[in-house]
């Protein structure tokens, strides 16, 4: 179960994310693997879990509960951010995803954002995905609904992110304490090879260019460093 946290403000949208995956599944850190898009690449299926385009639009995809991994007859969910990032705004990206057939994919959550708006998108295996604008404030999403405090991870960590400035969010992502259901940074060696494999910090301010930082490993081990701009060139 991946985690993504957003702070949505009049000054912009600020994002922190941990990617949880089987440690044996190969991936590459963010780069310009696609024209005008900077993001990590899943080597197995060729898509991405989180990426940023040259227009300052971010798209991320998360598995919903009990849907880890591929399934026969289903397309890779990693192509969904790439579809969204053909667009020039979060509004247009949300509209593009809601025109798709959700039945082509295993169940998914998506987060779409730019400096002016953020959306939660759910795809539940039938019909078309549904997009919901996220209000100002702090929002945490994992494998279910936004800010669902019935989920132990959200119940524990949402108040911590809400109380901390964005400059401290990288340290919060690194927290591996607590029982498994509440852990934000999961040690793969202690969980049958499944755990937190990398992390992202992304600022989308209205008044300046995006700032994209990436930790190429669990965030208590790997340092955050700047990665490619998605701008042309």
What are these regions (language model features)?
Residues 1-233:
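N-terminal nucleophile
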């Amino acid at each position: 179960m991946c985690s993504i946290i957003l702070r949505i403000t009049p000054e912009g949208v600020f994002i922190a994310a941990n990617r949880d995956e089987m440690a044996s599944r190969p991936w590459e850190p963010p780069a310009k693997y696609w024209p005008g898009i900077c993001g990590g690449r899943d080597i197995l299926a060729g898509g991405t879990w989180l990426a940023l385009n040259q227009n300052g639009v971010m798209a991320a995809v998360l598995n919903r509960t009990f849907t880890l991994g591929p399934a026969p007859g289903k397309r890779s969910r990693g192509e969904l951010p790439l579809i969204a990032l053909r667009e020039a705004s979060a509004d247009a990206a949300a509209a593009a995803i809601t025109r798709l057939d959700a039945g082509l994919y295993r169940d998914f959550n998506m987060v779409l954002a730019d400096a002016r708006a953020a959306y939660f998108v759910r795809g539940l295996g039938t019909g078309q995905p549904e997009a919901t604008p996220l209000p100002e404030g702090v929002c945490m999403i994992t494998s279910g609904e936004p800010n669902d405090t019935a989920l132990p991870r959200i119940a524990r960590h949402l108040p911590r992110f809400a109380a901390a400035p964005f400059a401290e969010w990288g340290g919060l992502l690194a927290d591996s304490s607590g029982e498994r259901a509440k852990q934000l940074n999961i040690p793969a060696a202690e969980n049958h090879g499944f755990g937190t494999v990398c992390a992202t910090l992304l600022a989308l301010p209205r008044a300046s260019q995006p700032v994209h930082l990436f930790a190429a490993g669990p965030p208590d081990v790997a340092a955050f460093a700047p990665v490619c701009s998605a701008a042309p060139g």
